[in-house]
Amino acid sequence: DGIASITTTQKHSEYDTNWQDEVLKTALVQDYNVSLSGGGDSGSYFVSAGYYNNDGVSYGNTFDRYSFRVNTQGKKGWFSFGENLAYSLTNTDPNQTNTYNDFLRMMPTIPVYDENNPGGYGYGDAAKYNTFGVNPIARENLEKRHMRQNRLNGSLWLEFKPFEFLSYKFNGGVDLYFYENSWFRGEGNWQQNQEHRDPESQKARDNTYNMLIEHTLNFNKDFGKHHVDAVLGTTYQHHEWEGLWASRLNFPMLGNGDYLTVLNAGQSNQQNTNSISENAMISYLGRVNY
C-alpha cells in the first residue's frame, strides 16, 4: 500500500528507561540543634551545637554541616571579660553536571548501563538512539568531587577598670579557614565521541589565617566645669594564606573495582603548584576631647 517496511533501527527497543526516576529521588533532610544557656549577676553563658544533612534530590549530590558555638561573659571586681567562639565543618559532594538538563536529553530507549561501552554505561550510538546527551548516572559515578571546609572564628576581650575614669581593654580575634577540594575522574565515557582519558586525580588546599590584637586605654573625667576624654591604643593585624594544587594520572584499580586515589599512586603526569602570601600591619591611635 505504499507504506515502507519497518527497518531494524525503527524497531521498538527492549529498554524503557525512565531517566527522571533514575536521576531524581526523595531526599532526606535532617536538622538538629541543641543549646544551653544560663547566668547570674557575675556572668552568663550560651552554648549551642547543630547538625544539618541534605541528601539532595538529584543523584550524586549530598551536603552536611556540623556547627558549634560558645559565648560567655563575666565580671569580677575590677575585671570583666568575654569571648565568642564559633566552629563549623561542611562536607559537599556536588553534581558534576546539570542533571535536570541531561536526563531530559536522554532517550528512554537508551539503558543506564551498557557493557559494550567504555566504563559500562549507556549513551546511544550513531546507528540507533543517536543523541549527544550526557548519561548523568555515568558522569556522577565516573567523575567525583568532594569539598571540605573547616572554619574557626573567635574573639576574646578583657577589661581592667581600677578607677571609674580609667580603663584598659584588650581585644583579640582569630579567623581560621581550611579548604580542601578533591576531584577524581575514572576511566570510561558518559556520552558519544568522548576521547579516552586515563584515571586522573586533582587535589587542592587553601589555608587562611587572620589575627587581630588591640590594646586601648580610655580616660574620661570631669575637672569642675571642665571635661576631658581620651583614647590611646594600638592595633595589630596579621594575614597568611597558602594554596596547594597537585594532579596525577593513571591510578590503579583495586580488587573491589574502586580506584586507589592517593596522589602518590598516580603513575604519570605529575603536576604541582604552591603559593604563599603573608602581610601584617600595626597601627597607633590617639584622640583627646576637651
Go through each PLM region and give its residues:
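Periplasmic N-terminal accessory/gating domains of Gram-negative outer-membrane beta-barrel systems
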Residues: 16-27
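Outer-membrane beta-barrel channels and translocator barrels
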Residues: 29, 40-41, 75-79, 161-163, ...
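Surface-exposed loop/interface segments of Gram-negative outer-membrane beta-barrel transport/assembly proteins
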Residues: 1-16, 56-153, 169-283
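Structured alpha-helical segments in the cores of large, soluble enzyme domains
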Residues: 28, 32-38, 280-290
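Short glycine/proline-enriched loop/turn "hinge" motifs that connect secondary-structure elements
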Residues: 35-41, 188, 252-255, 289
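Predominantly transmembrane beta-strands of Gram-negative outer membrane beta-barrel pores used
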Residues: 23-24, 31-53, 57, 69-75, ...
